[in-house]
Amino acid sequence: MLTLPFDESVVMPESQMCRKFSRECEDQKQIKKPESFSKQIVLRGKSIKRAPGEETEKEEEEEDREEEDENGLPRRRGLRKKKTTKLRLERVKFRRQEANARERNRMHGLNDALDNLRKVVPCYSKTQKLSKIETLRLAKNYIWALSEILRIGKRPDLLTFVQNLCKGLSQPTTNLVAGCLQLNARSFLVGQGGEAAHHTRSPYSTFYPPYHSPELTTPPGHGTLDNSKSMKPYNYCSAYESFYESTSPECASPQFEGPLSPPPINYNGIFSLKQEETLDYGKNYNYGMHYCAVPPRGPLGQGAMFRLPTDSHFPYDLHLRSQSLTMQDELNAVFHN
């Protein structure tokens, strides 16, 4: 039995024909592909018109996508500064103007709403305008106070109503609310704090602490008084008697016949009694120079010192003036000796 090799061309002529046909088809497909792409690009270019801004944007994107530099070196990836062109500057300027216009309109609307809220809130003044935060706080308190009235079902007291309105508000706003509701601000402060607004204590008590001396005791017949009001009876003419043998004619009246009352004090730096509203210190200095030859009975300047009540604290100016008087007496004594 004879056998022929499989590779000979005589045996399988059809297979060679198929092979040639397949190769020709593949070559034709490769040639047709670039032609079809070029036709599609031409057709799209005719039908679609590009805007100048879009062209510049696409060109910039293409430039950004390039990974190689002009020299062929790889570029650094990341944020790069874009080229400042006229179109880009105009776009940035237009966006900024739009943002400013939106913010301006928003603020105008907010201010109009706050003005309408100020007309409703119980606080009106022709000269003073509430701030934004004070208006919102007062509106919140007003809504809460009205809701409490509806919940209780009774008409509240005016004082409590104002107290509820003024929670967390500043002092000028509180005064405006009290004036709008025809309520005295002083009485409102007294009611709100639960204690009197005016105190009998001196404003200088924080700077000058009280001095307690064993010599200053409660006068007879006045044991029920507090320690803050206690005062030892003292003859204010002792300074006059220390320089002269006889007593002063002005001190002929008995000492403290009526109830005790501390002398009025002017806190402007001047200690004055009821008879004297102002003191001329230049005359006191001349008076000391004129009568300095008379020797005092006690130590130098002892009679010139005043004994003060325990609760009366005087400013620093008064202490300086009393010290200046004693120093003047010492200088006079030195010059005459």
Swiss-Prot record:
<feature type="compositionally biased region" description="Acidic residues">
    <location>
        <begin position="54"/>
        <end position="71"/>
    </location>
</feature>
<dbReference type="Pfam" id="PF00010">
    <property type="entry name" value="HLH"/>
</dbReference>
<keyword id="KW-0217">Developmental protein</keyword>
<dbReference type="InterPro" id="IPR011598">
    <property type="entry name" value="bHLH_dom"/>
</dbReference>
<dbReference type="GO" id="GO:0021542">
    <property type="term" value="P:dentate gyrus development"/>
</dbReference>
<keyword id="KW-0804">Transcription</keyword>
<keyword id="KW-0238">DNA-binding</keyword>
<dbReference type="GO" id="GO:0061564">
    <property type="term" value="P:axon development"/>
</dbReference>
<dbReference type="InterPro" id="IPR016637">
    <property type="entry name" value="TF_bHLH_NeuroD"/>
</dbReference>
<dbReference type="InterPro" id="IPR022575">
    <property type="entry name" value="NeuroD_DUF"/>
</dbReference>
<feature type="short sequence motif" description="Nuclear localization signal">
    <location>
        <begin position="80"/>
        <end position="86"/>
    </location>
</feature>
<keyword id="KW-0805">Transcription regulation</keyword>
<keyword id="KW-0524">Neurogenesis</keyword>
<dbReference type="GO" id="GO:0045944">
    <property type="term" value="P:positive regulation of transcription by RNA polymerase II"/>
</dbReference>
<keyword id="KW-0539">Nucleus</keyword>
<dbReference type="GO" id="GO:0001228">
    <property type="term" value="F:DNA-binding transcription activator activity, RNA polymerase II-specific"/>
</dbReference>
<dbReference type="InterPro" id="IPR050359">
    <property type="entry name" value="bHLH_transcription_factors"/>
</dbReference>
<dbReference type="InterPro" id="IPR036638">
    <property type="entry name" value="HLH_DNA-bd_sf"/>
</dbReference>
<dbReference type="GO" id="GO:0046983">
    <property type="term" value="F:protein dimerization activity"/>
</dbReference>
<feature type="region of interest" description="Disordered">
    <location>
        <begin position="43"/>
        <end position="82"/>
    </location>
</feature>
<protein>
    <recommendedName>
        <fullName>Neurogenic differentiation factor 6</fullName>
    </recommendedName>
</protein>
<dbReference type="Pfam" id="PF12533">
    <property type="entry name" value="Neuro_bHLH"/>
</dbReference>
<keyword id="KW-0221">Differentiation</keyword>
<feature type="domain" description="bHLH">
    <location>
        <begin position="94"/>
        <end position="146"/>
    </location>
</feature>
<dbReference type="GO" id="GO:0000981">
    <property type="term" value="F:DNA-binding transcription factor activity, RNA polymerase II-specific"/>
</dbReference>
<dbReference type="GO" id="GO:0070888">
    <property type="term" value="F:E-box binding"/>
</dbReference>
<keyword id="KW-0010">Activator</keyword>
<comment type="function">
    <text>Activates E box-dependent transcription in collaboration with TCF3/E47. May be a trans-acting factor involved in the development and maintenance of the mammalian nervous system. Transactivates the promoter of its own gene.</text>
</comment>
<dbReference type="GO" id="GO:0005634">
    <property type="term" value="C:nucleus"/>
</dbReference>
<comment type="subunit">
    <text>Efficient DNA binding requires dimerization with another bHLH protein.</text>
</comment>
<dbReference type="GO" id="GO:0007423">
    <property type="term" value="P:sensory organ development"/>
</dbReference>
